[in-house]
Structure formats: structure tokens, C-alpha cells
Amino acid sequence: MLMPRRMKYRKQQRGRLKGATKGGDYVAFGDFGLVALEPAWITAQQIEAARVAMVRHFRRGGKIFIRIFPDKPYTKKPLEVRMGKGKGNVEGYVAVVKPGRVMFEVAGVTEEQAMEALRIAGHKLPIKTKIVRRDAYDEAQ
């Protein structure tokens, strides 16, 4: 599971998911990418599920680039505990994803394989996604 090695502060505030992504909005490493169309927190488990689904589809060959990292801790209080008495314990880590963010990229496979693998990976995520191709515009950047 992906998680930070060490953090300056153990717990964070939730924050808000306003606006579009500030960066990571074009295919940089692979030939095809999976782009988020909605804002969401993507958990480390969801990222791993999508990665495993793509690896299994490719069998051998192909390279997967994970462009998001779960660096935000989220907390949860135990069941049947009254409100108050401080913030809960860290339950896991999430990646904050905004619309337009390229989350996964693939290279070294045919277009049909890439499209199908990214479609399967998209079903593992809690948001709407679309598949994009690296364009001449992207290569110019």
C-alpha cells in the first residue's frame, strides 16, 4: 500500500475540493492516461486495486505510471465513541484528486490493450474518468 515514509504532522485538516487541478493535467510519461472528471479523495487501497487490475490485464509487458500519491492522512474515531475527546486516529492515506488530473498512464502496449486496461482501472475508482491519448500538443510541452 502506498503511504508517506514520514510526515511533519501526523494529522491534517480535511480541506476543500475546489476548482480544477493545478498541475499534472497532461500525459507526461506514457502513451495513454486516465483523467479524473470529478473531485475526490482516492484512497491507497483504490490506487492499488486499479494498479493490480491493469497489471493483470497486461499479463507481461507494458509500463504503468501512477501519477497520484496518497499523502493526506484521514482519521476515524472508533465505533460507539461519543463526540469530542480529540481527533480520531489515522485510518489511512488519501490522494486529493481534482478534475483534469492524470492519475494513471500506460506505455509499451497496443492501443486496444491500453484502452481496456484503463477502462477496468476506472471502474475501481469512485469517480467518473476518461481515457486520453498523448497528443502532439503534449509532446511539445
From Swiss-Prot:
Record keywords: Ribonucleoprotein, Ribosomal protein, RNA-binding, rRNA-binding, tRNA-binding
Family: Belongs to the universal ribosomal protein uL16 family.
Known role: Binds 23S rRNA and is also seen to make contacts with the A and possibly P site tRNAs.
Self-association state and partner proteins as the record states: Part of the 50S ribosomal subunit.
Top-level taxonomic group: Bacteria
Protein name: Large ribosomal subunit protein uL16
Cellular component terms per the entry's GO annotation: cytosolic large ribosomal subunit
GO molecular function, one term: rRNA binding
Keyword tRNA-binding (UniProt): yes
Gene it is expressed from: rplP
